[in-house]
Regions:
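Intrinsically disordered, low-complexity acidic/Ser/Thr/Pro-rich linker and tail segments
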Residues: 1-57, 64, 83-95, 181-238, ...
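Repeated scaffold domains used in trafficking and secretory/extracellular systems
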Residues: 18-32, 58-73, 103-114, 143-161, ...
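Short beta-strand elements that form the blades of beta-propeller/WD-repeat-like
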Residues: 28-39, 66-81, 86, 110-121, ...
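Conserved blade-register residue in beta-propeller folds
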Residues: 47, 87-89, 129, 173-175, ...
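Surface loops and adjacent helix of pleckstrin homology
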Residues: 50, 123, 132, 168, ...
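Eukaryote-skewed repeat-based solenoidal scaffolds used as protein-protein interaction platforms
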Residues: 94-103
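Long, internal scaffold/assembly segments composed of regular secondary structure
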Residues: 104-205
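Loop/turn-rich, solvent-exposed surfaces of beta-rich toroidal or solenoidal domains
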Residues: 245-287
Length: 287
């Protein structure tokens, strides 16, 4: 094992705290224009200045707990209809106008906005992509026969090359090619073909009670069993069994696919170099 690095913890304290008479449900930051987009549990979408908390704009939605996606001047949220998404476009700082609606024609399980494209997973095993500028469908992928059939989707993401799907169950992590619209790699394939490593955190001092985020240094140790072979439970530590993947995200700056489970984090390093060019062997790290 590599020796652990010298102990230190970076702490991020809130610069400001804003109180509201409504409970926030989903929050997205627009750092380039220094404001926050938020939905509330009561069904409101609003924007506010990040420094002063001044309310910039708001609109009421037809139902409680709306999910929100926001990126590059576009905003998408569910409007209460099981197969529809509302699309809004920013016309000036913090102010949006309705641009239309995406009507999938299938009950929506999850959706994710990246740039001007929204990815939708449906309860009847479809993965649909739309261009929010034209509201036109651009991709259709059938998830039947994969780990994600019967609506087994907990999170989705995408980039220029792939769609990423996470679900309940230890092997429910899938990479799908955007151009081919076919499965490019599954977690079962990764586990079967490549060695695994584990990460262990340093010990931390007792928290002081102030609200904060802590960025912890990690050091790698090799482990003979971190993710087990197919259809066996893999464990982070004795007695803790991984049950589902809660999120998946590609990090372009490091060519790493990051997946969050209910008991740990999985990194698949060099995954695009491997899938697109065959120029590197991927490394799996779980902690």
């Amino acid at each position: 094992p590599r020796p652990p690095p010298r102990h230190h913890v970076h702490e991020l304290f809130p610069a400001a705290r804003r109180l509201t008479d409504e409970r926030a449900w989903r929050i997205r930051l627009v750092p380039e224009e220094h404001y926050v987009v938020m939905t509330t549990t009561t069904g409101r979408v609003c924007t506010a200045d990040m420094t002063t908390g001044e309310r910039l704009w708001e609109v009421d939605v037809l139902h409680r707990y709306p999910h929100l996606e926001c990126d590059q001047g576009w905003m998408v949220f569910d409007d209460g209809e099981p197969d529809e998404l509302d699309v809004w476009q920013s016309e000036r700082r913090g102010v949006y106008r309705r641009a239309g609606a995406i009507r999938a024609g299938h009950a929506i399980r999850a959706f994710r906005l990246v740039g001007a494209h929204v990815l939708v997973a449906t309860l009847d095993d479809l993965l649909l992509a739309y261009d929010v500028r034209s509201l036109a469908q651009t991709h259709l992928v059938h998830l039947g026969g994969t780990e994600h059939e019967h609506g087994n989707v907990t999170y989705i993401d995408m980039d220029d090359d792939f769609f990423y799907v996470a679900g309940a169950g230890q092997l429910s992590l899938t990479v799908i090619g955007r151009a081919s619209q076919r499965v490019a790699m599954t977690l079962h394939d990764w586990i079967a073909g490549y060695p695994l490593a584990s990460f262990v955190p340093e010990l931390l001092p007792q928290p002081c009670g102030a609200p904060r985020f802590q960025l912890r240094q990690m050091h790698a140790i090799r482990s003979p069993i971190v993710l087990a072979s197919a259809y066996q439970a893999f464990r982070h530590e004795p007695g803790i069994e991984m049950r589902q993947w809660d999120a998946v995200h590609p990090d372009a700056s490091t060519d790493t696919l990051v997946a969050l489970s209910d008991s740990g984090l999985l990194f698949i390093r060099h995954f695009k170099a491997h899938l697109l060019r065959g120029s590197a062997a991927p490394e799996l790290v779980y902690y």
